[in-house]
Design a protein with these regions (language model features):
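Active-site cofactor/cluster-binding pocket
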Residues: 2-256, 261-267
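Flexible, glycine/charged-enriched surface loops at secondary-structure junctions
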Residues: 3-5, 49-52, 192-194, 205-215, ...
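Gly-rich Lys/Arg/Thr-decorated short loops/hinges at beta-loop-alpha junctions or inter-strand turns
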Residues: 18, 158-160, 201-202, 230-245, ...
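Thiamine diphosphate
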Residues: 18-108, 258, 263, 271, ...
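Short glycine-rich or small-residue beta-strand-to-loop segments that form or flank ligand, phosphate
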Residues: 19-26, 178-180, 271-274, 321-324, ...
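Short gly/pro/ser/thr-enriched loop/turn and capping motifs at secondary-structure boundaries
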Residues: 56-60, 119-122, 305-308, 329-332, ...
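Conserved thiamine diphosphate
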Residues: 85, 91, 140-155, 364-413, ...
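Flexible, low-complexity linker and terminal segments
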Residues: 242, 250-259, 267, 397, ...
Length: 654
């Protein structure tokens, strides 16, 4: 079977620099698997890839409704990319609801493959179309897009009619038929997916008939693209110039889990992951639970508070305690996180942000927990906060969070978001020698036996204000522990007003001195630019790409990205002072902007997107253009609407 373009001239003529493909269908149609396989295949071919999974919030919305549509977007390219793409080049819509939910994102002239079988009157009604109207029969869509009507469900049934599978199981294979069509259109080989299907179903699940059926459907879709002659053009995307090394595809949650394991080895501590399931952080538990051979212990607690307290207990016992959650869970953990601050015990809290408040948008991304991570506890209760910028960066950020927690005896909040947690990218596998060991010394005390022996002082401090880490059971280091205020030095319970003020200042200064572990922030772009675009967390790729695009037009702009949110880099004040204007794009209502205004008197402008979606590159470009041209006006912040940043479309519609 030929799976590559055999005509070199044709391949060159149809070469693309990148392609953005989106699969969309019911949550049971296997769109996540199809997208994941296209990602894996493209990565193995040597493309750079970036993905954007999109899950419905409902466990199982009514079939055929817009609320139940599941999507997976893949951007594969012949150059380095940082986002899953602004516009869709090819949409595969498995039913009318998927078509309705995603057609607006397809570029003019883009490819739209629809599963014609499912565009029945019943399904059109479920999707909310007017009676008697079928969008794939509307000339405007045929004029606007390359619209291909393929009866995928019917063709899949015909391909598997002799498989011996039940009609229900046959229907589950139609995602592979659709994937086969995409593989033909974009000149992708089948072997990676065939190997995956064989290993998953024939080997691990001992269901070879399921593997055979899916492989047959995949090949049938591919051969349909090759023989039906309805697709006049075939495309190819060359390899990307990626530095040599061993690569694997990782999601943010997967990279974070591996980073936690690596940190435990660097510290020579066992990793105890204590958690309560919550979207979108649950995958971290799924990745760590099978890792017992790495000394990992997982504990699924009865609630968020118990999980947090268990992780603190692990730190008290002398090991690496980590807990994971999302926004609502972080709120529940708040009191116990304050206990970790008061007791000065090491613990890492992973918060995968999602749309809020309350239950909010459980499966959608947001950056709205920054204030909660920094200030969301009673009393003056500081904690270190780190925010990785990409799926692969979650690995390094996890190691740094553990390093700070273990060596400085304090809680650290690792603030990711749903976009980078579920998104994926090629990740260059590092060597163990790339990382410094996490050096830890435990407290030891030999009683003198004298009457005036002061005993072990658990709250004495070194130059970083770090207190000794005493492991229970070590003779001579017995001490009080708990949430009541401690006497400076001895750790005895104290209600003295002056002592409380001293200890409050010590706890704040202890976090501030972590700045000596934080590298200076680096600026990318024009040194003489007047405008700085400053971001944090997941929007990194969109910001960098937008700034590069603007600079290619000959306009001067610079950008930088915060990874350490508290304490911030020591040179940040100096960097901010160099620019006349600062733009802060963030997926919230301006939380970082307000922090920087209060801390550095920085009169920044905000680009605030609170839609459960990551930034489009174009949205940031438009905001930059408005500031450079002086058309921004007096607004402190602008909000994108339907992909556009318009100063005249900012009125709040009630």
């Amino acid at each position: 079977m030929a799976t590559e373009t055999t005509n070199p001239a044709a391949a060159a003529a149809n070469a693309r620099n990148s392609a953005v493909v989106r699969f969309a269908g019911d949550s049971g149609d296997g769109m996540q698997l199809a997208g994941t396989q296209l990602t894996d295949t493209s990565a193995i071919l040597g493309n750079d890839v970036a993905t954007l999974p999109d899950y419905p919030a409902e466990i199982r919305a009514p079939a055929g409704t817009v609320a139940g549509v599941s999507g997976f977007q893949v951007n594969f390219a012949a150059e380095q990319i940082f986002t899953p793409g602004d516009v869709v080049n090819a949409l595969i819509a498995m039913n009318p609801a998927a078509f309705k939910a995603h057609i607006a994102d397809v570029e003019p002239g883009g490819i739209v493959v629809v599963n014609e079988t499912e565009f029945s009157k019943t399904n059109l009604k479920k999707a909310g179309f007017e009676p008697g109207y079928n969008p794939i029969e509307d000339e405007k869509y045929e004029q606007q897009f390359k619209l291909y009507k393929v009866p995928i469900t019917k063709l899949n049934q015909e391909a598997l009619k002799d498989s011996g599978m039940s009609p229900k199981d046959v229907n589950r294979c139609k995602n592979m038929f659709a994937l086969g069509i995409v593989y033909w259109i974009f000149d992708r080989p089948l072997d990676t997916t065939i190997r995956h299907l064989t290993e998953t179903f024939a080997v691990r699940k001992n269901r070879p008939e399921v593997a055979d059926a899916n492989i047959a459907a995949l090949k049938a879709g591919y051969f349909f693209g090759e023989t039906a002659e309805i697709f006049p053009v075939r495309y190819s995307v060359a390899k990307a110039p990626i530095p040599k090394g061993l690569y694997r595809k990782v999601t943010g949650n997967e990279a974070l889990a591996m980073g936690l394991i690596t940190a435990s080895k660097l510290a020579k501590k066992s990793l105890h992951y204590c958690t309560y399931p919550i979207t979108p952080a649950s995958d971290i538990l799924h990745y760590l639970a099978p890792a017992k051979n790495f000394g990992v212990k997982t504990f699924q607690a009865e609630d968020e508070i118990a999980a947090m307290c268990a992780a603190i207990g692990v730190g008290f016992a002398g090991q690496l305690g980590v807990t994971g959650t999302s926004g609502p869970g972080l709120a529940l953990k708040g009191e116990a996180l304050g206990l970790a601050v008061m007791t000065e015990l090491p613990v890492v809290v992973v918060n995968v942000q999602r749309g809020g408040p309350s239950t909010g948008l459980p499966t959608k991304t947001e950056q709205s927990d920054l204030w909660q991570a920094m200030y969301g506890r009673n009393g003056d209760c500081p904690a270190v906060v780190i925010a990785p910028q990409s799926p692969g960066d979650c690995f390094n950020a996890a190691i740094e969070a553990c390093r700070i927690a273990l060596t400085r005896m304090m809680p650290v909040v690792l603030l990711t978001d749903g976009y980078i947690a579920n998104g994926s990218e090629p990740w260059r596998v590092p060597k163990e020698s790339d990382f410094e060991p996490i050096e830890i010394t435990h407290a030891d005390y030999e009683p003198t036996g004298e009457k005036d022996d002061p005993g072990f002082a658990p709250y004495t401090r070194n130059e970083n204000l770090t207190r000794p880490w005493a492991i229970p059971g070590n003779p001579g280091t017995e001490h009080r522990i708990g949430g009541l205020e401690k006497a400076n030095g001895s750790g005895a319970v104290s209600y003295d007003p002056t002592n409380h003020q001293t200890m409050t200042r010590i706890r704040a200064e202890k976090v501030a001195r972590v700045a000596n572990m934080v590298p200076d922030i680096q600026v990318t772009g024009d040194e003489d630019a007047k405008l700085l675009v400053l971001g944090w967390g997941g929007p990194y790729g969109s910001i960098l790409t937008a700034v590069n695009n603007i600079r290619e037009q000959g306009k001067k702009v610079a950008c930088t990205h915060l990874r350490y949110m508290n304490p911030m880099p020591s040179n940040l004040r100096e960097v901010l002072a160099k620019f006349d204007q600062v733009l802060i794009p963030e997926l919230n209502n301006g939380q970082l902007r307000l922090i920087l205004r209060g801390k550095y008197l920085c009169d920044a402008r905000g680009l605030n997107k609170i839609q459960g979606k990551p930034f489009l590159i174009e949205e940031i470009e438009q905001a930059i253009e408005l500031l450079l041209s002086g058309e921004w006006g007096d607004a402190e912040a602008l909000y994108p609407v339907d992909g556009n940043v318009d100063v005249n479309a900012q009125a709040l519609e009630v």
